[in-house]
Amino acid sequence: MATLEQNLQEMLQDAVEDLGCELWGIECQRVGRFMTVRLFIDKDGGVTVDDCADVSRQVSAILDVEDPIADKYNLEVSSPGLDRPLFTLPQFERYIGQDIAVHLRIPVMERRKWQGKLERIEKDMITLIVDDQEQILVFGNIQKANVVAKF
């Protein structure tokens, strides 16, 4: 069964691309009966405030017609930023050689949180270098991941 995020991704992907942006990912967060829907968009040269406004208007119109969210919700549209969340294996592949932070659904070696250099991706597994040791994590066990911004 598809998640709300997956349904929204499928529903909104083409509309966002028609506006010249990539739908990087979607996060839905429920607090009580209220939901926040966050769309992360990206494009070559960076995302502008106008891009976010255009996508927000288009997506709002689609959500008003399709009505996929039963409760009240707030729509937020933004760039993924420097510490961008990673949603798909192809997105992880773009950041091989960089530091990422990962939060797991089920602990591995009694840890849910891992941070290290993304070494490689094989099938549905990612390999991080953590304290000079390889740590292999199953993609399906990743609840949340993001690039660690270096300043």
From Swiss-Prot:
One of its GO terms (biological process) is ribosomal small subunit assembly. InterPro entries: Ribosome_maturation_RimP (IPR003728), RimP_C (IPR028998), RimP_C_sf (IPR036847), RimP_N (IPR028989), RimP_N_sf (IPR035956). GO terms for cellular component: cytosol. It is found in: Cytoplasm. Pfam families: DUF150_C, RimP_N. Keywords: Cytoplasm, Ribosome biogenesis. It comes from the Bacteria. Belongs to the RimP family. Required for maturation of 30S ribosomal subunits. This is Ribosome maturation factor RimP. It comes from Haemophilus influenzae (strain ATCC 51907 / DSM 11121 / KW20 / Rd). The gene is rimP.
